[in-house]
Every structure is written in structure tokens, then in C-alpha cells.
């Protein structure tokens, strides 16, 4: 099952969503997508509906 993880890049304030298996760690998700772990925080997990309605980029 995939979950929608909402992240925020701390330097720019940009928010984005990564879809990943529910057993994946935040570090695994960000490393796979090529984001710098030092500058990204996980905010929350969104439902499919919330992710769709957010208008944010989904990786």
C-alpha cells in the first residue's frame, strides 16, 4: 500500500509529496528521490484525496 508523505524543503519552504510504500522510512524516500536529507522535513501523511486536492508536485 502506498502512502502520501508531505515534505517541506527548509531553505525554500517548497512543499512536495512523495508516494512510497507504508514500510519505507523518510530517509529511504528522500534518498531514492534525490533530495538532501539535511534540508527536508516530513510534515505529515496525507490521504489520497488530500494529496490530489493539494495541487502539490507528487514524486
Model-predicted regions and their roles:
Residues 1-14:
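Short aromatic-glycine-(Arg/Gly/Cys) micro-motifs in beta-strand/loop hairpins
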Residues 1, 28-31:
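N-terminal leader/targeting signatures
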Residues 31-59:
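Short, mixed-charge low-complexity intrinsically disordered segments
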Residues 16-18:
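Short cationic amphipathic helices and targeting signals
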Amino acid at each position: 500500500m502506498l502512502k502520501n508523505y508531505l515534505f517541506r524543503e527548509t531553505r525554500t519552504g517548497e512543499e512536495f509529496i512523495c508516494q512510497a510504500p507504508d514500510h519505507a522510512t523518510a530517509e529511504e524516500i528522500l534518498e531514492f528521490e534525490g533530495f538532501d536529507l539535511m534540508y527536508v522535513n516530513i510534515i505529515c501523511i496525507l490521504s489520497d484525496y488530500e494529496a490530489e486536492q493539494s495541487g502539490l508536485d507528487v514524486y
